[in-house]
Amino acid sequence: GRAPAPPAEPVALRASASYLVTGGLGTLGLAWTRWLVRRGARHVVLAGRHPPGAKAREALAALASAGARVRVVQADVASPAEVTALWRRLDDGPPVAGVLHVAGLTEDAALGATAWDSFARVLAPKLAGAANLAAAAAAREHPLDFFVGFSSIAALLGNRGQAGYAAANAALDAQIAELRARGVPAWSIAWGPFAANTRPEVLTAAQRRGIAALEVDAALAVFERLLAGPPGHAVVMAVDRARGEPPAGVANPALFAGWTGWSAAPPPAGAERDASAGAADLLAQLAGATPDQRLALLTDAVNATTRGVLALDPAFALAPEQRLDELGLDSLLAIDLVQALGVALGTTLPTTLVMDHPSVAAIARYLANELT
């Protein structure tokens, strides 16, 4: 929903307490660590699976010069044993007053091509990580002032190639709700894509749905408002309201009904009819064609559809045998291509089509064999 009104007073943190940030060495973890220090925190522990890189070390030096004691602990929060060891380290300092659970992992792939091991790896930091951290905190004498889980709009809108990530964040949202039911001041914030740490192709896919990139400073301002209010679940994303409709993929447009100028817009009149007619025309041409003509028609159709998905310059020569991943067709765009070809041909195609047949010519040959 919309951001709450700004708090009368900015959030003040305690210099006599410690604050834990998981995923603390990443772009967002460091941004929120700087916020903690600006708001008065003087003891911060950053947990991550890997040692700090050059940029993180530079950020840590700046935080130290600001008067904060920032410790880095290498730990996988999905491991109960490592979280237990982490909390023993925390017990050496002031009591922990707040947890920012930023840690997460993505392994994008079409669901049909996703192995369970990959799915489980993506679930682990969000689901097991939150459970392990909450259990460790509950075993301590001092209650938390806040526990904030960094979730994603993937749990609300879905995202092509991110079934595991969507499930992980939905599970995190549910787990945070359970913590609130047990009396823990816990927030779950489903963030939209950030400009600072999101791959360009993912931002492009989001923009096609009417979702803009979040800037960290704007997100921090909203975060502070949320933390000054009652614990709960919030969705924070930058949306292109000029579209005049909710973001594409929203299962319940009524969620956005209070936003002026938005409504549950139906598809353009005749859009489905036009798509069906186009598919029927192509299928009719294929039905009366010789094998060589069928292959040529399908090659042209795949070529045109690929150009549209990749937004290629009309002057660019797309070689039939060139691998599409060499042109920037990642797993998300590959799913777009499969769906677009399915519409063009009036059929459902396997989600692994591009993985199995990675060029225009290979896809056309596959279709020529399948559509006989």
Residue ranges and their predicted role:
Residues 44, 253-256:
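Short loop/beta submotifs within extracellular cysteine-rich repeat domains
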Residues 1-247, 261-372:
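4′-phosphopantetheine-dependent carrier domains
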